[in-house]
Amino acid sequence: MKYAIVEISGRQFWIETGKYYDFNRIPTELGKEITLNRVLLLNNEGEILIGKPYLESVTVKGKILEHLRGRKTLVYKMRPKKKTRKKQGHRQELTRVLIEEIKTN
């Protein structure tokens, strides 16, 4: 099984070829190809390569499928025995990316 651990916008993701993942919003158009260069680890059928901090010879190709919004998160602040209440919601902007290829040079 071939997989890689990639850093995108400060977070690390375990990715495999042929699957799609939701990342924080990437400001590009739908259907465009993207290249992920910050590969931290690669497992190529049992052969493990670890970067220091990144692997220069490995790139991950992906395609942007859609831009979407995540589930709503509610934040509710309240002070007991007072009439102070504050309810606030947040929906994270996401980009769904299909991983097409993990390529080693």
Swiss-Prot record:
Give Gene Ontology CC terms.
chloroplast; mitochondrial large ribosomal subunit
Job of this protein: This protein binds to 23S rRNA.
Name used for this protein in its record? Large ribosomal subunit protein bL21c
Entry's localization field: Plastid, Chloroplast
Is Phosphoprotein there in the keyword field?
no
Pfam families referenced in this protein's UniProt entry, alphabetically: Ribosomal_L21p
Tell me the GO molecular function terms.
rRNA binding; structural constituent of ribosome
Give the UniProt keywords, A-Z. Answer: Chloroplast, Plastid, Ribonucleoprotein, Ribosomal protein, RNA-binding, rRNA-binding
By sequence similarity, the record places it as follows:
Belongs to the bacterial ribosomal protein bL21 family.
Domain of life of the source: Eukaryota
Q: Which gene encodes it?
A: rpl21
Give any single GO term for biological process: translation
* The organism of origin for this protein: Trieres chinensis (Marine centric diatom)
Spell out the subunit comment: Part of the 50S ribosomal subunit.
